[in-house]
Amino acid sequence: MKETAFIIDRDLAPYVNCIYTDENFDVNGHTNIPLYADGYPGIMFQQTENGFFLLPKNKKLSQLFLFGQTLEPVSLDIKGAYKFVVIQLYPFASKYLLGIDPKVLNDDCYDLLEINYINVEKYRQSLIQTNNLDTQVKIISDLMRALIRTHKISENDKIEKAISIIIQNNGQIKIKELLDKIYMTERTLERNFMAYIGLTPKQFSKIIQFQSSINKLTQSTYNSLLDIGYDSGFSDQSHFIRTFKSYTGQTPSYYLNHLSNR
C-alpha cells in the first residue's frame, strides 16, 4: 500500500489520519497483504472480481467496510486484479462513525452496506461509477459526515489528547506520567479507552511501541536488532522478539529477511 498525498477536508481532519491506495492489474495474480497492528482503524472501498478475504478467518469482505484495531496477525487475500482506497482513521474515529462498542471491531471488519439507517448503497453505486481517486475520497467523506451526524457521539478531548501523547512518545510513556498530563484517574482512563478505542491504554501503547519498532526495521541507521529493541523501549532482546512475534507471527529477523527478498 502507498500513502497518497491528499488534503483532508477541514471538518474531517480530526478523524482522518491519511489515505492509502493500491492496485494490481494481473488477472492471474494472487496477492496476500499482511495487516499488522498499528493503532488505526479505517474504511476501505475495494474493487475486484473475486472479492477480498480476511485470513485466517477466510471471511469474504464487503466492497465497502470499516476495519477495527488489529491485535492478531491477519491478512487480506486477493485473487486476480484489484484496486482499493483506504481512509485511515484516528483510533477513536470508529466510535464517532458507528456509535458501537469499538471492541467488537477488533481483528474484524464491519460491513457498511448492512447499515439500515443510511442508504449506504447509494454511496457504493457512486463509488463504482468513477475511477477518480479524488471523487472516491469525496464520496466516502460524504458518507462519513452522514454517519457522524446520525450518531452525534460526544467528543472526548482528554482521550484524544492521551492518544496523541502516546503516539508522540512512540508508546514509551508510563501510564502514571500520562495521567499527570491529562488529569484523569487510571480507572477513568481505562474505561474511556475501552469505550472509544476498544483497547486499554497499555494495549494501545504496546501497539504503538511495536509499530515504532517495525518502522525502525526498515531503516538502515541501526547496526543490530538489539539496538532497535532498546531504542524502541523494550527491556531486552527476548522481550522485543516475543512482542514482535505476537503481532506478526514472525521473528524480527525473519520479517527483515522476507522484506529484503521481495
Listing of model-derived features with the role each one plays in the protein:
Residues 1-160, 166-170, 175-176, 182-186, ...:
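Alpha-helical bundle regulatory/interaction domains
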